[in-house]
Structure formats: structure tokens, C-alpha cells
């Protein structure tokens, strides 16, 4: 459900996150447009995506460090980087949905969170191809671009769609996978359906919207 009223002005913190995500997305969208050419290249798409991941993370770190010099970082690629301020840090996933990215599916996102004293105070998920910017700040509600969003009023499983991930066959035992498929079957029988979009961050954003 989307609303177009009661929108507070973006805080300085959210503005910093939005600007960083938009700036990093410029190169990321260019990389996405070149993925098809890599299917026949010697380098290969997997190496390309790793490079795009690292490059996007670096850009985000530079932008956020410039705006908030004392914050530390928890990064998907580079790990934990303490800052001068021990109580505040950024948590970044530069490309959530890399498998979609490498196959030319526009279902991936930049994910940024601000943490203070071990608690998340603000978060942003940006799907750059369709320009969907989900953001929220503690006590201020959640938004998609400039519109207020709320969770659905559906209250039963039969009315609801479910999002999930699917484990890779190379991980876990055959018994683990059989159990997962049995659980999927059980949910499918009592719900409106199951979706597997390929980006956990966007799954959560769509639930919020």
C-alpha cells in the first residue's frame, strides 16, 4: 500500500545514503549493460561481477567516508573497517543479487545501513535499473522514492505471497534439500504462491511495500 502524504523531509543521514547509492549506481548500470558481452569473453562473467562488486563497494565507501569521516564500515568484500567513532558504522552490500546481475536480470540492489551502538538507525535499498529507492529511518516510517509505504493488510497465509531463497545443490546434504522442497510444498498448498526473486534485500523491501 502506497501513500503520498505525511512525508517528512529526508534527514542529513538519509540524504548522504541516497547520494552515495545514486553515484555508485552510475558505473554499476554501465557494468550491467556490458554483461551480455562477457558471456563469450575469456575473462568470463563471474570475474567481471567480482570486479563490479569491489568497484561499487569502493565507490560507496569513498562517498560515505567523505560525508561521515569518523564512521567505520562492515563491508561484504573488504570486511570490517573500524572508524574513529567506535559507536557508528556503515554496513554495505554493493550488489545484492549478483546471480541476477550476471545473467542480465534487473533484480539486484545496492544495500546500505547505518548502525549506532549496535542498532540499525537507517537503511536504504536501491534497485538502480528501475530507479526504486526504498529507505527508512527509525521513527520516521518507510518510503519508496517519495511515497510512504506500509505493509499489506493481508492477515492469512491463503491471501499472501511468500518470498524465499533456494539453497545451492552444492551446499548441504541431499536430505537438507529434500526437507526444503517438502517445506516449499507445504507452504504452496496453503498460500497464494511462492516467489524467488534472487535478491533478499529486495524481497524484504517488497514485503515492507
Q: Each PLM stretch: what is its role?
A:
Residues 28, 53, 64, 98, ...:
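Residue-level signal for inorganic ion chemistry
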Residues 84-143:
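DPxDG-like acidic metal-binding loop motif
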Amino acid at each position: 500500500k502506497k501513500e503520498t502524504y505525511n512525508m517528512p523531509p529526508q534527514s542529513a543521514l538519509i540524504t548522504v545514503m541516497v547520494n552515495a547509492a545514486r553515484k555508485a549506481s552510475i558505473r554499476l548500470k554501465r557494468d550491467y549493460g556490458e554483461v551480455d558481452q562477457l558471456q563469450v569473453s575469456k575473462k568470463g562473467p563471474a570475474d567481471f561481477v567480482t570486479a563490479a562488486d569491489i568497484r561499487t563497494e569502493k565507490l560507496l565507501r569513498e562517498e560515505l567516508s567523505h560525508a561521515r569521516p569518523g564512521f567505520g564500515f562492515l563491508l561484504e568484500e573488504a570486511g570490517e573497517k573500524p572508524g574513529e567513532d567506535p559507536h557508528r558504522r556503515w554496513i554495505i552490500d554493493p550488489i545484492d543479487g549478483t546471480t541476477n546481475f550476471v545473467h542480465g536480470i534487473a533484480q539486484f540492489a545496492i544495500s546500505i545501513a547505518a548502525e549506532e551502538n549496535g542498532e540499525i538507525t537507517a537503511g536504504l535499498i536501491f534497485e538502480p535499473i528501475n530507479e526504486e529507492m526504498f529507505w527508512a529511518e527509525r521513527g520516521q516510517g518507510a518510503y519508496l522514492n517519495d511515497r510512504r509505504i506500509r505493509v499489506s493488510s493481508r492477515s492469512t497465509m491463503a491471501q499472501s505471497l511468500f518470498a524465499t531463497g533456494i539453497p545451492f545443490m552444492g551446499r548441504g546434504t541431499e536430505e537438507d534439500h529434500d526437507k526444503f522442497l517438502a517445506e516449499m510444498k507445504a507452504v504452496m498448498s496453503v498460500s497464494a504462491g511462492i516467489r524467488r526473486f534472487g535478491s533478499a534485500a529486495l524481497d524484504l523491501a517488497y514485503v515492507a511495500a
